[in-house]
Amino acid sequence: MSAAFLRVGLDAPADLLPELTELYAGCLELRLVQPDAAAVAFEVGETVLEFRPAGGAPFYHFALLVPGDRFEAALAWADDRVELLPDPETDEVVFDFTSWDAKAAYFHDPAGSIVELIAHRGVGEGGASGAFEAAELLGLSEVGLVCDPPAAAEALRHELGLELWDGTVEGEARLAFVGEKARTLILCRAGRPWLPTGRPAEAHPVEVMLAGGPDGVVLLDGGGRVSRRATGDGPTVRASPSPRHDVRGG
Protein backbone atom coordinates (compact mmCIF):
# COMPACT_ATOMS: atom_id res chain seq x y z
CA MET A 1 0.00 0.00 0.00
CA SER A 2 1.00 3.63 -0.36
CA ALA A 3 2.42 5.42 2.67
CA ALA A 4 1.06 8.78 1.47
CA PHE A 5 -0.34 10.78 4.38
CA LEU A 6 -3.96 11.83 3.85
CA ARG A 7 -4.46 13.27 7.32
CA VAL A 8 -2.17 13.77 10.33
CA GLY A 9 -3.73 14.66 13.66
CA LEU A 10 -1.56 16.10 16.44
CA ASP A 11 -2.31 17.40 19.93
CA ALA A 12 -1.53 21.00 20.87
CA PRO A 13 -2.19 23.20 23.91
CA ALA A 14 -5.60 24.82 23.43
CA ASP A 15 -4.26 28.31 24.10
CA LEU A 16 -1.75 27.93 21.26
CA LEU A 17 -4.28 27.14 18.52
CA PRO A 18 -4.54 30.84 17.52
CA GLU A 19 -0.74 31.09 17.26
CA LEU A 20 -0.59 27.88 15.23
CA THR A 21 -3.25 29.30 12.93
CA GLU A 22 -1.27 32.51 12.55
CA LEU A 23 1.87 30.57 11.60
CA TYR A 24 0.43 27.99 9.25
CA ALA A 25 -2.42 29.98 7.67
CA GLY A 26 -0.97 33.47 8.10
CA CYS A 27 2.80 33.33 7.70
CA LEU A 28 3.06 30.14 5.63
CA GLU A 29 -0.20 30.78 3.76
CA LEU A 30 -1.55 27.23 4.02
CA ARG A 31 -5.27 26.95 3.36
CA LEU A 32 -7.28 26.74 6.58
CA VAL A 33 -9.77 23.90 6.14
CA GLN A 34 -11.14 23.44 9.66
CA PRO A 35 -11.41 26.71 11.60
CA ASP A 36 -13.49 25.73 14.61
CA ALA A 37 -13.19 25.54 18.38
CA ALA A 38 -12.59 21.79 18.41
CA ALA A 39 -9.49 21.82 16.19
CA VAL A 40 -7.70 23.65 13.41
CA ALA A 41 -6.57 22.01 10.20
CA PHE A 42 -4.54 23.11 7.19
CA GLU A 43 -4.13 21.79 3.68
CA VAL A 44 -0.54 20.78 2.88
CA GLY A 45 -0.64 19.33 -0.62
CA GLU A 46 -2.16 15.85 -0.39
CA THR A 47 -2.25 16.00 3.45
CA VAL A 48 -4.57 17.65 5.95
CA LEU A 49 -2.54 18.66 9.03
CA GLU A 50 -4.77 18.93 12.10
CA PHE A 51 -4.07 20.27 15.59
CA ARG A 52 -6.46 19.22 18.37
CA PRO A 53 -6.63 20.95 21.77
CA ALA A 54 -5.06 18.96 24.59
CA GLY A 55 -3.40 19.39 27.95
CA GLY A 56 0.30 19.37 28.66
CA ALA A 57 2.93 20.52 26.18
CA PRO A 58 2.99 17.99 23.33
CA PHE A 59 5.48 18.45 20.51
CA TYR A 60 6.35 16.41 17.42
CA HIS A 61 8.66 16.04 14.49
CA PHE A 62 7.17 16.11 11.00
CA ALA A 63 8.35 17.18 7.56
CA LEU A 64 6.76 19.12 4.71
CA LEU A 65 7.62 17.76 1.26
CA VAL A 66 9.03 20.19 -1.30
CA PRO A 67 9.44 19.28 -5.00
CA GLY A 68 12.96 18.01 -5.60
CA ASP A 69 13.85 20.88 -7.94
CA ARG A 70 12.45 23.65 -5.71
CA PHE A 71 14.45 23.43 -2.51
CA GLU A 72 16.39 26.68 -2.92
CA ALA A 73 13.22 28.61 -3.70
CA ALA A 74 11.42 26.97 -0.76
CA LEU A 75 14.33 27.79 1.52
CA ALA A 76 14.10 31.49 0.62
CA TRP A 77 10.31 31.36 1.12
CA ALA A 78 10.70 29.82 4.58
CA ASP A 79 13.57 32.11 5.58
CA ASP A 80 11.31 35.13 4.97
CA ARG A 81 8.65 33.72 7.31
CA VAL A 82 10.26 31.70 10.12
CA GLU A 83 13.54 31.45 11.99
CA LEU A 84 15.46 28.52 10.54
CA LEU A 85 17.29 26.29 13.02
CA PRO A 86 21.06 25.97 12.48
CA ASP A 87 23.21 22.89 12.69
CA PRO A 88 24.88 23.30 16.12
CA GLU A 89 28.18 22.03 14.69
CA THR A 90 28.40 24.09 11.49
CA ASP A 91 25.86 26.90 12.07
CA GLU A 92 24.46 26.14 8.60
CA VAL A 93 20.68 26.00 8.14
CA VAL A 94 20.76 23.60 5.18
CA PHE A 95 21.19 19.90 5.95
CA ASP A 96 22.46 17.78 3.06
CA PHE A 97 21.43 14.12 3.38
CA THR A 98 23.61 12.70 0.65
CA SER A 99 22.57 9.06 1.14
CA TRP A 100 18.97 10.10 0.44
CA ASP A 101 19.88 12.65 -2.27
CA ALA A 102 17.86 15.12 -0.19
CA LYS A 103 18.22 18.54 1.38
CA ALA A 104 16.34 19.90 4.38
CA ALA A 105 15.87 22.85 6.71
CA TYR A 106 14.12 23.06 10.08
CA PHE A 107 12.09 25.49 12.18
CA HIS A 108 9.95 25.46 15.32
CA ASP A 109 6.23 26.07 15.37
CA PRO A 110 4.55 27.81 18.35
CA ALA A 111 3.90 24.47 20.07
CA GLY A 112 7.59 23.56 19.93
CA SER A 113 7.26 20.96 17.19
CA ILE A 114 10.34 20.50 15.03
CA VAL A 115 9.09 21.12 11.49
CA GLU A 116 11.24 20.16 8.54
CA LEU A 117 11.20 21.24 4.90
CA ILE A 118 12.68 18.44 2.81
CA ALA A 119 13.23 17.94 -0.91
CA HIS A 120 14.25 14.60 -2.43
CA ARG A 121 15.94 14.86 -5.80
CA GLY A 122 13.64 13.34 -8.44
CA VAL A 123 10.48 13.51 -6.31
CA GLY A 124 7.63 15.75 -7.46
CA GLU A 125 9.75 17.77 -9.86
CA GLY A 126 7.61 19.83 -12.21
CA GLY A 127 10.06 22.35 -13.60
CA ALA A 128 8.51 25.35 -11.83
CA SER A 129 10.49 28.57 -11.50
CA GLY A 130 10.26 31.88 -9.70
CA ALA A 131 9.21 32.54 -6.13
CA PHE A 132 8.00 29.54 -4.16
CA GLU A 133 4.37 29.33 -3.03
CA ALA A 134 2.74 27.24 -0.32
CA ALA A 135 0.54 25.58 -2.94
CA GLU A 136 3.67 23.83 -4.28
CA LEU A 137 4.08 21.76 -1.10
CA LEU A 138 3.33 18.14 -1.98
CA GLY A 139 2.17 16.96 1.46
CA LEU A 140 3.77 15.63 4.60
CA SER A 141 6.92 13.63 3.95
CA GLU A 142 7.70 12.36 7.45
CA VAL A 143 5.88 11.85 10.73
CA GLY A 144 7.79 10.85 13.86
CA LEU A 145 6.26 8.11 16.02
CA VAL A 146 7.88 7.89 19.45
CA CYS A 147 7.33 4.27 20.34
CA ASP A 148 8.96 0.87 20.76
CA PRO A 149 10.49 0.62 17.25
CA PRO A 150 10.77 -3.20 16.94
CA ALA A 151 7.15 -3.74 17.96
CA ALA A 152 5.84 -0.84 15.88
CA ALA A 153 7.81 -1.90 12.79
CA GLU A 154 6.44 -5.43 13.03
CA ALA A 155 2.88 -4.14 13.47
CA LEU A 156 3.19 -1.83 10.46
CA ARG A 157 4.64 -4.63 8.34
CA HIS A 158 2.07 -7.21 9.41
CA GLU A 159 -1.03 -5.00 9.31
CA LEU A 160 -0.23 -2.58 6.48
CA GLY A 161 2.61 -4.15 4.52
CA LEU A 162 4.85 -1.16 5.25
CA GLU A 163 8.51 -2.14 5.23
CA LEU A 164 11.65 -0.72 6.79
CA TRP A 165 13.47 1.04 3.96
CA ASP A 166 16.31 2.70 5.90
CA GLY A 167 17.74 2.77 9.40
CA THR A 168 17.25 0.04 11.98
CA VAL A 169 14.99 -0.84 14.89
CA GLU A 170 18.01 -1.91 16.95
CA GLY A 171 19.94 0.43 19.24
CA GLU A 172 18.78 3.14 21.58
CA ALA A 173 20.10 6.01 19.42
CA ARG A 174 18.95 4.77 16.01
CA LEU A 175 15.95 5.66 13.88
CA ALA A 176 13.86 3.33 11.73
CA PHE A 177 12.32 4.66 8.51
CA VAL A 178 9.19 2.76 7.48
CA GLY A 179 7.14 3.22 4.32
CA GLU A 180 8.86 4.63 1.26
CA LYS A 181 11.13 7.47 0.19
CA ALA A 182 9.46 10.85 0.78
CA ARG A 183 6.51 9.26 2.63
CA THR A 184 8.00 7.90 5.82
CA LEU A 185 7.01 7.02 9.36
CA ILE A 186 10.05 7.61 11.58
CA LEU A 187 10.13 5.20 14.51
CA CYS A 188 12.04 6.66 17.43
CA ARG A 189 12.54 5.69 21.06
CA ALA A 190 11.59 8.17 23.78
CA GLY A 191 14.58 10.23 24.86
CA ARG A 192 16.42 9.97 21.56
CA PRO A 193 17.49 13.51 20.47
CA TRP A 194 15.74 15.04 17.46
CA LEU A 195 17.83 16.82 14.85
CA PRO A 196 18.84 19.62 14.87
CA THR A 197 18.09 20.84 18.40
CA GLY A 198 18.95 17.70 20.35
CA ARG A 199 15.64 17.88 22.22
CA PRO A 200 14.78 14.42 23.58
CA ALA A 201 11.83 12.81 21.83
CA GLU A 202 8.65 12.43 23.86
CA ALA A 203 5.65 10.20 23.18
CA HIS A 204 2.45 12.15 22.52
CA PRO A 205 -0.75 11.07 20.76
CA VAL A 206 -0.66 11.19 16.97
CA GLU A 207 -3.05 9.82 14.37
CA VAL A 208 -2.01 9.24 10.78
CA MET A 209 -4.41 8.31 8.00
CA LEU A 210 -2.64 6.63 5.10
CA ALA A 211 -3.74 6.37 1.47
CA GLY A 212 -4.69 3.02 0.00
CA GLY A 213 -4.72 -0.36 1.63
CA PRO A 214 -7.70 -2.42 2.81
CA ASP A 215 -10.83 -0.91 4.26
CA GLY A 216 -10.61 -0.24 7.95
CA VAL A 217 -8.57 1.78 10.38
CA VAL A 218 -5.43 0.39 11.93
CA LEU A 219 -4.75 1.82 15.37
CA LEU A 220 -1.16 1.58 16.56
CA ASP A 221 -0.26 2.70 20.06
CA GLY A 222 3.17 3.44 21.43
CA GLY A 223 3.59 -0.14 22.60
CA GLY A 224 3.12 -1.52 19.10
CA ARG A 225 -0.35 -2.97 19.75
CA VAL A 226 -2.70 -2.88 16.76
CA SER A 227 -6.47 -2.92 16.54
CA ARG A 228 -8.84 -2.27 13.65
CA ARG A 229 -12.19 -0.58 13.24
CA ALA A 230 -14.39 -0.33 10.18
CA THR A 231 -14.34 2.81 8.06
CA GLY A 232 -14.23 3.71 4.41
CA ASP A 233 -11.65 6.44 4.83
CA GLY A 234 -8.50 4.33 4.64
CA PRO A 235 -6.05 2.93 7.17
CA THR A 236 -5.02 5.04 10.14
CA VAL A 237 -1.99 4.64 12.35
CA ARG A 238 -2.44 6.01 15.84
CA ALA A 239 0.39 6.29 18.34
CA SER A 240 -0.02 7.16 22.00
CA PRO A 241 2.43 7.18 24.89
CA SER A 242 3.38 3.69 25.98
CA PRO A 243 3.16 2.91 29.74
CA ARG A 244 6.10 1.28 30.62
CA HIS A 245 23.33 7.96 15.67
CA ASP A 246 21.30 7.14 12.97
CA VAL A 247 21.37 6.77 9.19
CA ARG A 248 19.72 10.16 9.02
CA GLY A 249 19.40 12.62 11.86
CA GLY A 250 15.61 12.83 11.97
Task: Label each PLM-derived region with a short phrase.
Residues 95-100:
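Short loop/turn motifs at secondary-structure junctions and domain boundaries
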Residues 1-6, 10-34, 43-90, 101, ...:
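Glyoxalase I/VOC metalloenzyme domain signal
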Residues 36-38:
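Ser/Thr- and Asn-enriched, surface-exposed coil loops between beta-strands
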